[in-house]
Design a protein with these regions (language model features):
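Helix-loop boundary and gating motifs at the non-cytosolic
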Residues: 175-179, 183-212
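C-terminal ends and interior cores of transmembrane alpha-helices
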Residues: 1-27, 261-294
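Intracellular juxtamembrane helix-capping segments at the cytosolic ends
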Residues: 45-61, 314-330
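Helix-to-loop junctions at the C-terminal end of transmembrane segments
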Residues: 92, 238-254, 360
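Intracellular loop-helix junctions on the cytosolic face of multi-pass helical membrane proteins
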Residues: 24-27, 31-36, 47-48, 52-53, ...
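Transmembrane alpha-helices of Major Facilitator/SLC transporters
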Residues: 225-248, 265-267
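A late C-terminal transmembrane helix in Major Facilitator Superfamily
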Residues: 331-361
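Loop-to-transmembrane helix entry
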Residues: 65-71, 111, 202-233, 299-300, ...
């Protein structure tokens, strides 16, 4: 809700009263609300995903192996992503529900608002269904682990236990965490800037909205990027069905290595496509270019979006499965393992978020430097 209504809230907090259709300057209050909303959203996502991944590892460890559980989780993530990207790819929420538009929130903002309101409804429905249908017996502290557990439980002790477990992890687990960190470092530039790359370097749009035509091209590119992410999620879901069999035949280590080499090739291709697209382009030529952009480069960019979903299926399943196998062999718990991996991923995301923008700005080459690194 904070993200969807950030522009309206920012207006009440002191942002410009000028209509959003004509104002192109910064809106700092709305930006602050937007950032807080995404901070809360990211916290909720990591909390939910970590719990579900640990549960899937526990449920599948006995008979099927961790790779099966993580592959199932990846399939459901892919299905949800396909539905989500399809909901925002065409930018028609503001036409279906004109009341979403305000003087502070124009078409693109109204589309975002509609998508997030739909997400709120789906979250409420899924929560109610889970609470009504899940047959779970509540256990008190005494029932779980006796008096000793009752004395050590609590939020602070949970962090103490986590860091104590990290200190006592085996060298094999530390190698898994290190490789996971480098893997996600290579992925986050794409995950964070994929639609921006499509809008700026393929469609030659201006995210600042200096001119209407440039702003239209950028938004058109972002929507096309959402279609690309839809294709990415489709290939991710299809590949997830093959991951367990491939891991049994070639081992998880080989599959992980192949996926990393695939990411290298695809990201290098995206850098090359971006350079070719922007070479010789001048903003003064924008009036002679169509909003749709160069068809051949569009098709090539969408193909790369679809192809990168294949190694993304490995990203969302194999590292977690490998960690679960290591911990299971050592007799440890899945919860601490998932928590450690989540921390490593968050640190990688933070590092990319703090450095990718300044690096791109220093070279003034769009997203190519971050993608290249």
């Amino acid at each position: 809700m904070l993200i969807g209504f950030s522009a309206d809230i920012g207006r009440y907090l002191g942002d410009t009263k000028e209509n959003c259709s004509t104002y192109t300057g910064p809106r700092w209050a709305a930006t602050a609300v937007y950032v807080v909303g995404f901070l809360l959203l990211d916290c909720v996502i990591h909390t939910a995903q970590a719990s579900v991944r640990a549960m899937m590892s526990d449920l599948s460890a006995a008979n099927h192996g961790p790779s099966i559980g993580q592959a199932i989780f990846s399939v459901w993530m892919a299905i949800g992503s396909i539905l989500g990207y399809a909901a925002v790819a065409y930018g028609t929420w503001h036409r279906w529900f004109p009341s979403l538009k305000t003087s502070a929130c124009c078409d693109a903002c109204a589309d975002l608002k509609g998508a997030f309101l739909t997400a709120v409804v789906l979250i409420v429905i899924s929560t109610v269904v889970t609470m009504l249908l899940a047959d779970e017996q509540s256990l008190d502290n005494e029932g779980v682990g006796g008096a000793a557990f009752a004395q050590t439980c609590g939020g602070l002790n949970a962090f103490i236990d986590l860091f104590a477990s990290l200190k006592n992890m085996s060298p094999a687990m530390f190698r898994v965490l290190a490789l996971t960190a480098f893997t996600w470092l290579s992925w986050f530039p794409f995950l964070q800037y994929n639609t921006d790359w499509m809008g700026r370097e393929i469609y030659h749009g201006n995210p600042n909205g200096v001119a209407d035509m440039a702003d239209d091209k950028y938004n058109a590119g972002v929507r096309e990027g959402a279609i690309g992410l839809l294709l990415c999620s489709a290939s991710l879901g299809a590949t997830s069905f093959l991951i367990p069999k491939l891991c049994r035949k070639l081992t998880s280590k080989v599959i992980w290595s192949i996926s990393l080499f695939s990411v290298f090739l695809i990201m290098a291709g995206m850098v090359a496509v971006g350079v070719v697209s922007t070479k010789g382009y001048s903003p003064s030529l924008s009036t002679s270019l169509t909003v749709a952009g160069p068809d051949n480069l569009n098709a090539l960019a969408l193909t790369m979006f679809a192809l990168i979903g294949i190694p993304q299926a490995v990203l969302y399943s194999v590292p977690w499965a490998v960690a679960a196998e290591v911990v299971a062999g050592e007799g440890g718990g899945q919860g601490v393992t998932v928590g450690a991996i989540t921390i490593v991923i968050s640190l990688s995301q933070l590092l990319v978020g703090l450095t990718a923008g300044p690096i791109d700005g220093a070279f003034n080459k769009g997203n190519a430097p971050a993608f290249g690194i």
